[in-house]
Amino acid sequence: MNLLIMGLPGAGKGTQAAKIVEEFGVAHISTGDMFRAAMANQTEMGRLAKSYIDKGELVPDEVTNGIVKERLAEDDIAEKGFLLDGYPRTIEQAHALDATLEELGLRLDGVINIKVDPSCLIERLSGRIINRKTGETFHKVFNPPVDYKEEDYYQREDDKPETVKRRLDVNIAQGEPILEHYRKLGLVTDIEGNQEITEVFADVEKALLELK
């Protein structure tokens, strides 16, 4: 089974990806892991990626696409199938993935989209606070400290609501064309992500069993 998982930051995509890998035995292909492995193994694309990263520059699409292609061509993919996580990030990368899969004789079986209302995600992501003395992390709503005094806690700049909203807006703008592309191919299953982790996975599992 060859899958793609999508979802906004804070939707719980990483948690569900880990559960899918555990339950269905597919190879988990996350962009971060892929880059690290390609650079460690000094593949052609890995060396290219490292040259950009070392200069503090963004890795161009063609290099990212090349690293994905290298990984998808490995033997375990034909045996186990894959779960792509964190790629494609742009519609151009989605088109490149289509071409790569066709070239390798592979087919995408489904796209799992973990849906959570952005307003809920802002609450999830912007509630994080850190104790100034101990460095411990808490959440204002979901895991509040027992003896909360505002002056004892601070919030990281990228956890502030306005920053979180900007980040979500960018992700929505990038993600919508990709989802639309796969919807036209009849591949997308939307999963309600604003429920307990076990309930989300029950819905994911049901959708994937129907694909088999």
Curated annotation (Swiss-Prot):
Give the UniProt entry's GO cellular component terms.
cytoplasm
Pfam families per record? ADK (PF00406)
> Which InterPro entries did the record assign?
Adenyl_kin_sub, Adenylat/UMP-CMP_kin, Adenylat_kinase_CS, P-loop_NTPase
Q: Where does AMP bind?
A: 31, 36, 57-59, 86-89, 93, 156, 167
Q: Locate the region LID.
A: 127-159
- UniProt keyword terms in alphabetical order: ATP-binding, Cytoplasm, Kinase, Nucleotide biosynthesis, Nucleotide-binding, Transferase
Q: Where in the cell is it found?
A: Cytoplasm
Primary location group? cytoplasm
Residues involved in ATP binding: 10-15, 128, 137-138, 195
Q: What is the enzyme's class at the highest EC level?
A: transferase
GO terms of molecular function: adenylate kinase activity; ATP binding
Q: What is this protein called?
A: Adenylate kinase
Gene name in the database record: adk
